Amino acid sequence: MNEQKYLSVSALTEYIKVKLENDNHLKRVFLKGEISNFTHHGSGHLYFSLKDEDAAISAMMFKTYASTLSFKPKAGDKVLVEGYISLYKARGTYSISIFSMTLDGIGELFLKYEQNRKMFQELGYFDESLKKPIPKFPKIIAVITSETGAVIQDIKTTISRRYLLAKIELYPILVQGEGSKDDIVKTLARVNRESQADVIILGRGGGSIEDLWSFNEAEVVVAIHQSKIPVITAIGHETDTTLSDYVSDLRAPTPTAAAELATPNMADLIKEIKDKVQLSQYYMNERIKNYTALILNLDERLELASPKSKLELEHKQIDNLTSKLTYFYKSKLTDNLNQVRLLSQRLTSPDEKIERYKERIETLTSRINLLYKKQVDLKTYEYQSSLKQLQGLDPLRIMQRGFSLTTKNQKVITSIEQINTNDELDIQYKDGTAKVKVLSKEGKHI
């Protein structure tokens, strides 16, 4: 009977260690799994387990590699790792030493993003010809975003500063996570169905690709494409571009920029009105000058073509003919006596024609003067009428006539239904503002 050779635990462990570390298949291993038992050691090293439904393996990542990660690992994260298998001799346990780790799923999201982008581009959803124009003077702006956070506050502040005449309608939604996609689609449909909004602002703050993913969903892209109301998107930061940004009618880099793109600047409008008044005055003066020059030119042409000028020419011809006739009379007095008498009767009495020509000249002169006066009066009236209309649009001139602007919480009050007893209101006059409190209200039945 042969005597058995017994190995020490150390020898067996060393043998297994050599086998593991010399196996080419284990020198570079690619694993995917879920992080559990995560510890971020004070030294900077990471210790955790990678598990799936049926097994788990210990894992570690030295500080040198951990410092290059683009995210902060935590328990529950699904990751893709690259590393090698090693054995801890003192405990006889093996583990994976990791030198590369990324979140699982981002690669799939980017792939899906590109597939959807190409599909919608081929369908023509991103064509510039389909972009609806943004109205210059919106009365109602529908804002689809979270009812909390900085986005809605930035939009409200910007619109209140630039264009108080616009009414803001907030439609709160879930901007990420489960149910957010359906919430966005339903809200877009609701605004198109129920609201009288002139433009929609669809926005949310920044975040990772997973946070913004609802705005890359095909259903959301289709809902924006089908909107009858123009849509301005302000999603994420300036460097983030979602499929919703591609299909929207206008993309803004920030919520503040979206509010600016949706509204005119009141100060710019007032300046534009003043500039147009000055331009209208200039063109009116130029037209009056042109019409005056035209009338003077016509007057000169009429004078040159007048009967008086023709008579002067005929007189010269008569004088010339008389000289010829005198000479002819001396040579052939007997033969042409009757003819000379007849010509004398016709040529020596032009008074009646001259009188008729004078009357025609006076009539034409009167008509020209009347036409000139009518043209000048008409252009002056049109100019004054345009000036009054433009001045009537100036809010300051409206206030100078006794009108005022009433607001509650920076919103313009246009109806008694917008206020209640004990509300505090701000009233702006031409030379200042007053804060008042509503003691009672009485509606006017129309």
UniProtKB/Swiss-Prot annotation:
<keyword id="KW-0963">Cytoplasm</keyword>
<dbReference type="GO" id="GO:0005737">
    <property type="term" value="C:cytoplasm"/>
</dbReference>
<comment type="function">
    <text>Bidirectionally degrades single-stranded DNA into large acid-insoluble oligonucleotides, which are then degraded further into small acid-soluble oligonucleotides.</text>
</comment>
<keyword id="KW-0378">Hydrolase</keyword>
<dbReference type="Pfam" id="PF02601">
    <property type="entry name" value="Exonuc_VII_L"/>
</dbReference>
<protein>
    <recommendedName>
        <fullName>Exodeoxyribonuclease 7 large subunit</fullName>
        <ecNumber>3.1.11.6</ecNumber>
    </recommendedName>
</protein>
<dbReference type="InterPro" id="IPR025824">
    <property type="entry name" value="OB-fold_nuc-bd_dom"/>
</dbReference>
<dbReference type="InterPro" id="IPR003753">
    <property type="entry name" value="Exonuc_VII_L"/>
</dbReference>
<keyword id="KW-0540">Nuclease</keyword>
<comment type="similarity">
    <text>Belongs to the XseA family.</text>
</comment>
<dbReference type="Pfam" id="PF13742">
    <property type="entry name" value="tRNA_anti_2"/>
</dbReference>
<dbReference type="GO" id="GO:0009318">
    <property type="term" value="C:exodeoxyribonuclease VII complex"/>
</dbReference>
<dbReference type="GO" id="GO:0008855">
    <property type="term" value="F:exodeoxyribonuclease VII activity"/>
</dbReference>
<comment type="subunit">
    <text>Heterooligomer composed of large and small subunits.</text>
</comment>
<keyword id="KW-0269">Exonuclease</keyword>
<dbReference type="GO" id="GO:0006308">
    <property type="term" value="P:DNA catabolic process"/>
</dbReference>
<dbReference type="GO" id="GO:0003676">
    <property type="term" value="F:nucleic acid binding"/>
</dbReference>
<dbReference type="InterPro" id="IPR020579">
    <property type="entry name" value="Exonuc_VII_lsu_C"/>
</dbReference>
